[in-house]
């Protein structure tokens, strides 16, 4: 039954993905308005997060950021549906994402055993599976093959939704016959077993610690005392990975710039806490640059 349900939902998404992106944005705007105005979806959470993160910002300015955030949330949904049936050529032709510094990535990746990339919920994280299909600002290709990418995710409670989201995020890779998603509980075993193979492990790292995960205080982030998980940097330190921060800036509707910022060459030479502190400093800088670009509905500070 699960397989049938997954195939039905995936079939609908792939069919919808063939429609123009402009149509999806139109529907996304309706979704955003309903989420913000009609259903007030986590509106209190958004406003509390914003007011505590920007204590000097006036209430009207906070409301404006919230409005822009919900519009962005609608765009994320629209782009995720459009992405679900897109191959590399379609992603490239659309220009939806541009990698700004492929040379920096290539130099670090090719000179180290493997790499850990610490991603965020800025921009549109649902588009990460198309990394190899995106344009670069210099024309230099990213020195990476399909089977070298691993994106870490937390398994959803609903098995159908979990499988749909997993396949949707890796649609472009699925089209060429591979996949990239690995559940967080299995990543250490996989990385150790494949330590002799150069790979990139992409970790979304800015969530509140999972229920069963150890909580580590990191100090202030966005003016609030923050607990973090150290699993991503722990893996990097244990296996001597290089580490990069993935910045995803929303330039305008339908245009993102992806920049990979080097954090260290050999994580085993750094403390896990220092790496994580550096990550949150970079994230705070990114959020301050474009406040509406982050996922404010997330209960980051519980």
Feature roles, as predicted:
Residues 33-34, 92, 152-153, 218-221, ...:
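Short, contiguous strand/loop micro-motifs
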Residues 38, 96-97, 157, 224, ...:
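Residues that cap or flank secondary-structure elements
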